[in-house]
């Protein structure tokens, strides 16, 4: 079965009332194993490649310093592996970029074969996050790719980015965000 965008899978979770996990894969063997487990349970799969994993899979061992070219190569390598191991599968599979750091990272993932991307502008001021997310939505939707945006920040370290405090999402801001960017999947920290 070919890879699918995130949106139809999320619509099915609402319609049929089930939860859906998403699993980060940082190597070809992990992608293969994740698909096999989902096939055993006849469950749809959301496999995620983090922005940093794309750099690593592009051959950059010091992935924190991966170039855009490294990320492009890595995104294609991850997508090729997921397509290879999912080609004969009867389950729907989404390949999602987890915590894309900027527009170019999202473009690299989409060009590589990802069917869904997350643009994480949560560390930006609200209006800048809206503008960045809107730009990604416009680019991605023109190519049939789903988009997830993010508001709010949890304290701690996520994808090697540290935040000392949490900023929970104001539900009214979430509605405003959604309306300003257009149709997208928004992760809210509430």
Where in this protein do the model-derived segments appear?
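Alpha/beta enzyme core
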Residues: 4-15, 28-90, 100-189
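Short catalytic-loop micro-motif centered on adjacent basic/acidic residues
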Residues: 20-24, 94-97, 118
